[in-house]
Amino acid sequence: MKFSRSIQAIDSHTAGEATRIVVGGIPNIKGNSMPEKKEYLEENLDYLRTAIMLEPRGHNDMFGSVMTQPCCPDADFGIIFMDGGGYLNMCGHGTIGAMTAAIETGVVPAVEPVTHVVMEAPAGIIRGDVTVVDGKAKEVSFLNVPAFLYKEGVEVDLPGVGTVKFDISFGGSFFAIIHASQLGLKIEPQNAGKLTELAMKLRDIINEKIEIQHPTLAHIKTVDLVEIYDEPTHPEATYKNVVIFGQGQVDRSPCGTGTSAKLATLHAKGELKVGEKFVYESILGTLFKGEIVEETKVADFNAVVPKITGSAYITGFNHFVIDEEDPLKHGFILK
């Protein structure tokens, strides 16, 4: 057998949402910072993302990451998040998956009862505490980058729906956060297709008509995700959500960065205090816990430091190959 590429990856899921973590078999990703590494990967090695995320090795809703050498000397490893549509600066469920995999495969030595992990993403340094029992990562709590409400009460005309009102908040990426009632739908699995269609239309309109720019991170200048929320069905949950991203992908988890953005939004509106309990429910009924640890500033924006808690499970170890004679070697999407 002769292959042009042999790639190793760890598969896991966090509250139902997949994370395929590439740990070997790809070229050196150049860059003096994680944003530079992300840019290099996108401009020079994007065929690896499409090969691993899309069919026949993946699927439309696949999510993944590439584990790299960090740029910050204090970090245990670097991470670049990706999906079927491109790359993300930060991902909460992916962070929980990566930290779990790092502990359970020995990338970071396990220390019981709690192992401290420092991960570097394009959005910044992420610090996590992993609860470890008998060498197994049971739960991950991580401090996300500062989150803040960027624009409140934005209104646009959404074709087929009418005028809708929403907030734009940052939780590692920019989110449009909209109540399900604005779209006339409930957050239920059978509505996933329609919710996705409307969310993608909304995201396109926002990025076409509204100027978006992170105040300190020049490379973050678009709304990448749409977070639709509603009243919960789980007795322990505060709210229920579904997050749509990429090329119309549906997050199965409550979305860690989306939870962070929601915490910041509620705090800015006086609806959630520092240290107050918050539980977010996914479209599947799985849960993340969220908490505001402290208040801070991002340039002129009032911001919060969110802590997100959840669990991930390794589901497999993959050894992918790329055959140059395969006409579909770099993946395809059919939807």
Curated annotation (Swiss-Prot):
Q: Which GO terms describe its molecular function?
A: 4-hydroxyproline epimerase activity; proline racemase activity
Read off the SUPFAM superfamilies from this record.
Diaminopimelate epimerase-like (SSF54506)
Q: Does the keyword Isomerase apply?
A: yes
- EC class name: isomerase
Keywords for the protein's UniProt record, in alphabetical order: Isomerase
List the active-site residues. Answer: C91, C255
> Does this entry carry the keyword Isomerase?
yes
Fetch the Gene3D superfamilies from UniProt: Diaminopimelate Epimerase, Chain A, domain 1
Q: Which domain of life does the UniProt lineage start with? A: Bacteria
Catalysed transformations (reactions): L-proline = D-proline
Q: How is its activity regulated?
A: Inhibited by pyrrole-2-carboxylic acid (PYC).
This entry's Enzyme Commission designation comes to 5.1.1.4
* Stretch forming the signal peptide: none
> Which family, according to the similarity comment?
Belongs to the proline racemase family.
Remarks, anything else? This enzyme does not require pyridoxal phosphate (PLP) as a cofactor.
* Role according to the record: Catalyzes the reversible interconversion of L- and D-proline. Plays an important role in the regulation of intra- and extracellular amino acid pools, allowing the bacterium to profit from host precursors and enzymatic pathways. Strong B-cell mitogen.
The record's annotation in NCBIfam families points to:
PRK13969.1
Task: Tell me how this protein assembles.
Answer: Homodimer.
Q: What is this protein called?
A: Proline racemase
Question: In which organism is this protein found?
Answer: Clostridioides difficile
* Source taxonomy: Bacteria, Bacillati, Bacillota, Clostridia, Peptostreptococcales
